[in-house]
Amino acid sequence: IKSYLVQRVNTYAFQHPIELMQNIDRVTQHIRTKHPEAQSLHFHHLESGENYLMDDDGFWRLSNYVPSITFDTCDDLNVVRNAGQAFGEFQMMLADFDASQLFYTIPDFHDTRKRYARLKADMEADPCSRVAEVRQELEWLLSVEDEACKLTDLFNAGKLPLRVTHNDTKINNVLFDEETHKALVVIDLDTVMPGLVGHDFGDAIRFASNFVEEDCKDADKAGVNLNVYWAFAEGFLKKTAATLTENEVDTLGISCFALACELATRFLDDYITGDQYFKIKYPDHNIVRTRCQIALAKNMQTKMDAMKAIVRDCWMRYRSSDLEDNKRPTKTVCGKTDIPFAPPSAAA
């Protein structure tokens, strides 16, 4: 007996569901054609060819059910590494796909310059008279604008290639085998569209490696756990080392800072304009979120040299050798044996 999963697409959040499903169809067909041994998400087609059904009750799709487990958060570094491999493999399998064929399901989603421009415009307009109470957060975000916009600026200068990106690389968007905890398949492809590899890497790190939840009220506890960072980077680069350009590799560390700052601008802009986009549980929820992302970004600044060194070390090792699937490299950037993860102190 086969099991299936029926979903109704949220057409309020995604106002172009047909194009969204076409994006998914194109990338999953590419994966099945070029990498038939890989498991990929698959939505079934009607006789007329569409991989969706529209009726009076909504916009529907049908996929195979995959027996599995998911993790919202996880301290098991092997699971984190496997998640990194899953998202890295997703990138690798689509490295030869022309990203310009895809529709932008959320236009300007990671155009950090435009996010900042919108924040500054709303700051000037101050529609809800809230700017005065968040002046300190605004001033810090504006002080790091150029650093936060580095990925956008490099792409606009033609120095980074356009890739197919997932754009929601949380660990809970990977299905894992219940017994072995090996990654089975990447899911939730609704935001698949053109982007930069740093968007996927940076957002995964921003979410997975923070010591606290993104709405922790004690922002001083926020920071990047370098053990988790190392684990994810190692898995990700094991799969992508051969396909990434050196410029892309050099931006992976700063991408984490950029994505934290970008999300902080979004939370803060939403607060300034009346909490219209993100769901809130209490009046200052978006301020709390903003402060937590700022604290995370500040902590990343203090660890940026280590973050860049970890990425460079993993990339150099994996691009130059054919390591067996379960073989563990022993050299680390801090000169200690990797058993199995030994990055600089996560508490530093």
Model-derived regions, located:
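All-alpha amphipathic helical-bundle segments outside canonical DNA-binding/catalytic cores
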Residues: 244-256
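Short acidic (Asp/Glu) and glycine-rich catalytic loops that position anionic groups and cofactors
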Residues: 2-7, 180-185, 208-215
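Active-site activation/catalytic loop segments of kinase-like enzymes and analogous catalytic loops
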Residues: 194, 198-242, 258-277
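ATP/Mg2+ or Mg2+-diphosphate-binding catalytic cores
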Residues: 262-329, 334, 339-341, 347
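Activation of the activation-loop gatekeeper triad in protein kinase-fold domains
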Residues: 187-191
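ATP-dependent phospho-/nucleotidyl transfer catalytic cores
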Residues: 14-18, 69-81, 96-166, 171-185, ...
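Conserved ATP-binding subdomain of kinase catalytic cores across diverse folds
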Residues: 2-3, 9-117, 197, 213-214, ...
